[in-house]
Amino acid sequence: MNKFLIIDGLNLVRRIYAAIPDENDMDSLTERVSVACTKLLRIHHPTHVTIVWDGDEMSWRKQLYPDYKKGRKPMPEPLAAGLPALQEHLKSVQIQSIYAAAEADDVIATLAMKTAKAQGEAVIVSTDKGFSQLNHPRISQWDHFNQQYLNITELEQKLGVDRSQFLDLLALAGDSGNKIPGIAGIGPKSAAELLRTFRTLAALFSSLPNLGAKQAKKLAEGRDMARLSYKLAQLQIDLPLNINLKDFRVNGPATTPQLD
């Protein structure tokens, strides 16, 4: 069975870079990233590996909602300047890059889902909990910095909803880290309570007459924003990839299928 290790490039590299005392020391960054990747390979024993990078194009989410991820700090100039050399180094040690046009998340999600549907196993290396919406038994998520898999049961308990409701929760309460708005006046706690009662957004919005007037008014006025927020939070899992798995094989090429 194929086991694909999919590394969220900037999620890994920026965290490592932030811990380097001298922001201009790209040699230290390259060394630390190499050590991290070697450790990942040793722990997970994948048949295939790639590291996926964000691109420079404006994402479809930003076009849809200009405030998406507004206020995020830009990449430090030394890191931006040193990234191509780091990517070349990783290539020299058989860790091939995939370059997304805009956000890496959709490419990672698509690659993981296509791998799982082809009866393979996908391990996503990222601290981004947005990947938890990929509800498939052959997809897991590894937190390199805490050296553990994302525990979905703990996350469900923390959020107060089932995994199948994660996107509905974001649609209602939003996500401040990514500037996904949600519905004004509906926080994570009240959103979770509503979803525990009504289970789905559709059932909730069809039951507004059963709610108190104040809350029903908030929900009715925020319905369009909830739809927008759901769309912004939802990962794309059907992008055309047009890659051949043999290019990402660990320890040399082998005859393996193409992922469209």
Curated annotation (Swiss-Prot):
Superkingdom of source:
Bacteria
Print the keywords alphabetically: DNA-binding, Endonuclease, Hydrolase, Magnesium, Metal-binding, Nuclease, Potassium
Q: List the disulfide bonds.
A: none
* Amino-acid positions noted as binding K(+) in the UniProt annotation, renumbered to this chain: 172-173, 181, 183, 186
Region annotation (Interaction with DNA) maps to: 185-190
**Residues given in the record as Mg(2+) binding sites:** 105
**Start and end residues of each 5'-3' exonuclease domain:** 164-254
Task: Tell me which EC number(s) this protein carries.
Answer: 3.1.-.-
Cofactor details (free text) = Binds 2 Mg(2+) per subunit. Only one magnesium ion has a direct interaction with the protein, the other interactions are indirect.
Q: Show the GO MF annotations.
A: 5'-3' exonuclease activity; 5'-flap endonuclease activity; DNA binding; magnesium ion binding; potassium ion binding
| Any single GO BP term | DNA replication, Okazaki fragment processing
Q: Which cofactor does it need?
A: Mg(2+); K(+)
Q: So what does this one do?
A: Has flap endonuclease activity. During DNA replication, flap endonucleases cleave the 5'-overhanging flap structure that is generated by displacement synthesis when DNA polymerase encounters the 5'-end of a downstream Okazaki fragment.
Give the family from UniProt.
Belongs to the Xni family.
Kindly provide the name given to this protein in its UniProt entry: Flap endonuclease Xni
